[in-house]
Design a protein with these regions (language model features):
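Cell-surface/extracellular proteins and modules involved
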Residues: 1-170
């Protein structure tokens, strides 16, 4: 099943000349239920590899690139250019388009580590805070990109149920 296959068709007159066309209602949005995302038995964590697209991941995991929409919907990805992990080459281009060479090494923010038991987290703090480390624009952007690398994949035994649920929602 393709993503838009079950979307409602509407009459739309884009020009306003009283000659409407039958079109797929692409404005319809479907979100995964919060309780379904909590069902970890249905999901497998996956680390997206270099140059993998949602289509490649879907093909590897679900056996067909047509299920890329499942990968994207499950991970709240609406724009693959902004929400999906960038390859090294894409990230470098993005950084050179956004920053000058000097700006890349400038401070983005400062942070400290806080630990409690076995857990350690980073907290942003003001410049000059004792023990704070500088995070450059480059380090910040790389970390932001890496956060997108780990995604959830639907286990194949739930794929049919997921498609049925999707069809009911659209």
């Amino acid at each position: 099943m393709s993503y838009f296959e079950n979307f409602q068709k509407i009459l739309y007159d884009p020009v306003g000349n009283n000659n409407p066309k039958l079109m797929t209602n692409i404005m319809k949005r479907v979100r995964m239920r919060a309780n379904m995302k909590k069902e970890v038995v249905m999901l497998d964590p996956y680390d997206v590899q270099e140059n993998e697209t949602p289509e490649i991941v879907a093909d590897k995991h679900h056996g067909s690139p047509i299920y890329h929409w499942v990968v994207m919907l499950l991970n709240d990805i609406s724009d693959v250019n902004h929400d999906w992990v960038k390859s090294t080459r894409q990230l470098q281009k993005y950084l050179t388009d956004k920053y000058t060479v000097t700006q890349l090494s400038e401070a983005h923010h400062y942070e400290i580590s806080q630990s409690s038991g076995d857990t350690s987290i980073k907290i942003q703090v003001l410049q000059g805070t004792s023990g704070a480390t500088t995070v450059t624009n480059y380090e910040y952007e790389v970390a932001l990109n890496e956060e997108k690398r780990t995604i959830d994949l639907l286990r194949n035994e739930y794929l049919g149920f997921f498609e049925d649920e999707f069809q009911n929602l659209v």
